Design a protein with these regions (language model features):
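Short, solvent-exposed loop/turn segments at conserved positions within beta-propeller repeat blades
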Residues: 43-57, 101-107, 150-160, 233-234, ...
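Residue-level signature of beta-propeller blades and closely related beta-rich strand-turn architectures
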Residues: 39-40, 97-99, 146-148, 236, ...
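Hydrophobic beta-strand positions that form the internal "hydrophobic ladder"
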Residues: 33-34, 92, 140-142, 230-231, ...
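Beta-strand-rich domains and repeat architectures in extracellular enzymes and scaffolds
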Residues: 13-55, 81-83, 210-236
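Short loop/turn segments that connect beta-strands within beta-propeller blades
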Residues: 64-67, 113-117, 168-169, 243-247, ...
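A short beta-strand motif characteristic of beta-propeller blades
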Residues: 7-17, 69-74, 118-123, 206-214, ...
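Blade-level signature of beta-propeller repeat domains, shared across WD40, Kelch, NHL, RCC1
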Residues: 143-170, 497-529
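Repeated scaffold domains used in trafficking and secretory/extracellular systems
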Residues: 18-26, 76-85, 125-137, 181-188, ...
């Protein structure tokens, strides 16, 4: 196994990056620590959704108050509701939880040991913990949401207050607090939103440390240029450019942010595709107009904007700009939209698009590739990998699944020679199963050259002449031998000792690896041979 890559530079770094969008924070004057709860968000967008299986973006970060260095970073399956440092012990109590959307209020009481980094989930049964407060060294006051809202229209405004005592909270074991200790009558409970004051607090703490808090999140696309510049698309930014010096050259802002970057055929500009989600405005849901813009790489000037009328995904490969509509609610089979410098033409019918079945972004594509169903009225079934010819015709190459009767979801891909390497997951009625995520290399006649199985879905992949690089939503980064699929190296992504996850990666022309992280940073990694 060869050496793992080394992070030699971090672009877009800043304090509190690890926790994403902050929800609340508390300062402990005794230990001079700051605890922050936040959310990195999902690792899916309207163009692709399979990477969100087994993912949670909820985080608890514990930072040094003076230097703002992240000392601990803990994943939570539920949003963070409350934080409280123990008055004496190196222990942080965290209340988490949410309503499941139909019946139950679920969550955990987490006890984070700041000396050993052990995390204890202390409740015997899942309960949303709205508030935690230390009354003394031995007494912890909890406010818990009702178990459910069955025949209780006031459940969302109620809480059950209980005081749990332990002689030594540092010795509490997993699932040690039973339901009998939490039994209490329901009372009105206020659930304030602390996000605005938390943002102000983090900005003030950063300013006091001589730093700036920016709140960057989720780098969805990253590309390296021949001259050493780095392009990226991320939340709130349609596209940005970083100079070889490490300074940000320009940025084009957007209400949602860019999700795709595709270098234009002229070599001097890049196409950027923005996310558009429905948002409630008053009593109605509204969706902003799609935004697909071509941006000059040198100056960041928006040169043109396409108006497809519906949200679409950019399809790479070839000289034309090709869009695949994402209007999944339409009853008509969708067609590709093909643009060149002088005109727009309708492409072949490809069926309706959904983010789980049809995501198939192919890097280094010599021609456009899409996933299409054999029945355009049921496009998610019996999908084939198809190529779009120069004349706009669609040629089916081989079935997406090489196992008969097995349904597979889409994922990232790369073309290597006369073959495609692509990642995905296998459908199962009970969700993603162990070994249900894969990377496979197949010849253009459909023959399987090799496959590599894992438990977590891939978020991104790319390749050079002999290695396939795969990022997973678990935070893993794996290099596979392009010839036989064996593991060259495997590592867990970290920045400053704190784990992170990569929604995007790209092999730069200079040979190093660019990794876009879920917390808004771009890692430049050297690949030692």
């Amino acid at each position: 196994m060869t050496s793992v890559p080394i992070v030699r530079r971090v672009l877009g770094d800043g304090p509190f990056a690890e926790i994403g969008e902050p929800a609340l924070a508390v300062i402990d004057d005794r230990s001079r620590m700051v605890a922050v709860g936040g959310d990195l968000g999902a690792v899916q967008w309207n163009g692709t959704g399979t990477a969100d299986s087994r993912w949670t973006g909820h985080r608890i970060g514990v930072y040094e108050r003076d230097a703002l260095r992240c000392r601990h970073l803990v994943r939570s399956w539920y949003p963070v509701r409350s934080l409280a440092f123990h008055p004496v012990l190196p222990l942080l109590a965290v209340g988490t939880g949410r309503y499941d959307g139909g019946y139950s209020f679920e969550g955990e009481l987490l006890l984070i040991h700041l000396d050993s980094r052990n995390v204890v989930s202390a409740l015997q049964h899942p309960r949303e913990v709205l508030s935690v407060e230390w009354r003394s060294e031995t007494a912890l006051r909890l406010v818990l949401a009702p178990c459910d809202d069955w025949e209780n229209p006031h459940a969302h405004e109620q809480g059950h207050t209980a005081v749990v005592t332990r002689a030594d909270w540092g010795a509490v074991e997993q699932r040690a607090i039973g339901a009998e200790e939490l039994a209490a009558p329901a009372e009105p409970a206020v659930q304030p939103d602390h996000s605005a004051e938390t943002r102000r607090l983090l900005a003030d703490l950063a300013d006091a440390a001589g730093q700036q808090w920016s709140g960057r999140r989720r780098v969805w696309a990253v590309e390296g240029m021949e001259d050493g510049r780095v392009l990226a698309a991320l939340d709130g930014v349609l596209a940005e450019s970083w100079l070889p010096s490490g300074d940000r050259q320009w940025a084009v802002e957007d209400e949602e942010g860019g999700r795709q970057l595709v270098l234009a055929s002229d070599g001097t500009s890049v196409w950027a595709n923005a996310e558009r989600r429905s948002r409630r405005k008053g009593r109605h849901w509204e969706t902003s107009a799609p935004r697909l813009a071509r941006i000059a790489i040198d100056a960041g000037q928006v040169l043109e904007t396409l108006s497809p009328g519906v949200c679409a995904v950019l399809i790479t490969g070839g000289q034309r700009t090709i869009l695949r509509p994402m209007d999944g609610g339409s009853k008509r089979p969708a067609r590709l939209m093909m643009y060149d410098l002088d005109s727009t033409v309708d492409g072949p019918e490809v069926g309706r698009y959904d983010l789980f079945n049809h995501g198939f972004a192919v890097r280094s594509a010599s021609r456009p590739y899409v996933l299409v169903g054999t029945d355009l009225d049921k496009p998610h079934k019996d999908k084939w990998i198809a190529a779009v010819g120069a004349d706009g015709t669609l040629r089916r190459l081989f079935p997406h699944s090489w196992v008969p009767q097995e349904h597979r979801f889409g994922g990232p891909a790369v073309e290597i020679g006369q073959s495609l390497v692509y990642a995905g997951t296998v459908h199962h009625g009970h969700g993603l199963q162990p070994g249900g995520a894969y990377v496979v290399r197949r010849s253009l006649n459909g023959a399987v050259q090799w496959q590599y199985r894992t438990d977590h879905p891939a978020t991104a992949l790319d390749a050079d002449e002999d290695t396939v690089y795969v990022a997973y939503n678990s935070g893993a980064l794996t290099a596979l031998d392009a010839d036989n699929g064996s593991v060259r190296w495997h590592t867990e992504l970290e920045v400053g000792g704190a784990p992170t996850t990569a929604p995007s990666l790209a092999v730069a022309p200079q040979g190093h690896l660019l990794v876009g992280t879920v917390d808004g940073r771009i890692l430049e990694c050297s690949l030692r041979r």
